[in-house]
């Protein structure tokens, strides 16, 4: 039987968080990452949040599912951010923008098994240290396509899929919990249909993904629990495909990505 796809949602809206928990979302992310983010993402359609410690407390006291805090990238501030997040009720921590496996190792030492650890692989420098990263005792990895695009000077976030970088991460971190891209309602997704992304997540052996920022908009006037169930049903169907269907679906996705990028 296929394990469900772990779905994590960014929100500081208590009512939405409670509805998401009832619908079957696995965890809620409060986003503290802000240092240097506006500068590196200027000119790109990317989201920058300004969540606070109070947001963590409000969400953590309103739900029973895990609340996860994305702290800033490793720096002198990291020990204090980790302690504050834990004091506020965080049960998981996400480290973004690591440049080295040593950064990740330091982060893990600071957390000291007190919370789940998710490492974002979103710099070319860390991609080049995967052999060291796989030896560390983190809980999950999420490939951040947007910042990886900026790190590599690429024209599209999808180039890392087309050129095999994403597959290389999955294969190197084989049998660990890894995810990328984003989920939304079945039938949604632009410019690439979500079901195509879901099929690629399945092909690569993904375990988790984040809900897209468009999810809250696309879920309007829909039954959230029914939509989450539809995602999991589509996930199970993706995992039930035979080798020929997997290959055909991959080729269709890559053709669509090439058309979108213009290569």
Predicted features along the sequence, with ranges:
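Conserved N-terminal beta1-alpha1 strand-loop-helix module at the mouth
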Residues: 1-65, 74-76, 256-263
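Hydrophobic faces of well-ordered beta-strands that scaffold small-molecule active sites
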Residues: 5-11, 28-30, 67-71, 93-95, ...
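Catalytic cores of alpha/beta
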Residues: 14-22, 76-88, 103, 124-137, ...
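Glycine-enriched alpha-helix->loop->beta-strand junction motifs that scaffold or abut catalytic
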Residues: 23-28, 86-92, 111-117, 135-142, ...
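Active-site pocket-lining/capping segments in soluble small-molecule metabolic enzymes
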Residues: 31, 36-42, 149, 161, ...
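Active-site-adjacent beta->alpha loops and helix N-cap segments on the catalytic face
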Residues: 36-59, 75-79, 96-115, 125-131, ...
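A structural motif corresponding to the C-terminal end of an alpha-helix
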Residues: 58-66, 169-178, 204
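Glycine/small-residue-rich loop that forms an oxyanion/phosphate-binding "nest" at active or ligand-binding sites
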Residues: 65-96
């Amino acid at each position: 039987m296929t394990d469900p796809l772990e779905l994590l949602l960014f929100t500081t809206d208590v009512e939405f968080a409670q509805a998401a928990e009832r619908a079957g979302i696995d965890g809620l992310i409060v986003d503290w990452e802000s240092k240097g983010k506006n500068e590196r993402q200027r000119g790109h359609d990317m989201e920058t949040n300004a969540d606070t410690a109070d947001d963590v407390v409000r969400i953590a006291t309103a739900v029973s599912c895990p609340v996860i805090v994305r702290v800033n990238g490793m720096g002198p501030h990291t020990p204090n951010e980790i302690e504050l997040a834990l004091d506020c009720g965080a049960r998981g921590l996400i480290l973004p923008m690591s440049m080295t496996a040593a950064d990740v190792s330091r982060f893990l030492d600071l957390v000291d098994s007190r919370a789940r650890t998710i490492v974002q692989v979103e710099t070319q420098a860390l991609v080049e240290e995967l052999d060291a990263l796989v030896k560390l005792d983190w809980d999950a990895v999420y490939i951040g396509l947007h910042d990886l695009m900026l790190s590599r000077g690429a024209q599209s976030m999808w180039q890392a899929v087309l050129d095999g970088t994403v597959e290389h991460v999955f294969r190197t971190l084989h049998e660990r919990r890894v995810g990328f891209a984003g989920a939304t309602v079945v039938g949604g997704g632009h410019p690439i249909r979500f079901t195509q992304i879901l099929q690629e997540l399945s092909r690569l052996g993904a375990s988790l993904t984040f809900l897209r920022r468009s999810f809250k908009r696309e879920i309007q006037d829909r039954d959230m629990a029914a939509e989450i169930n539809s995602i999991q049903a589509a996930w199970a169907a993706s995992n039930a495909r035979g080798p020929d269907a997997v290959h055909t679906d991959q080729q269709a996705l890559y053709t669509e990505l090439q058309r979108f990028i213009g290569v």
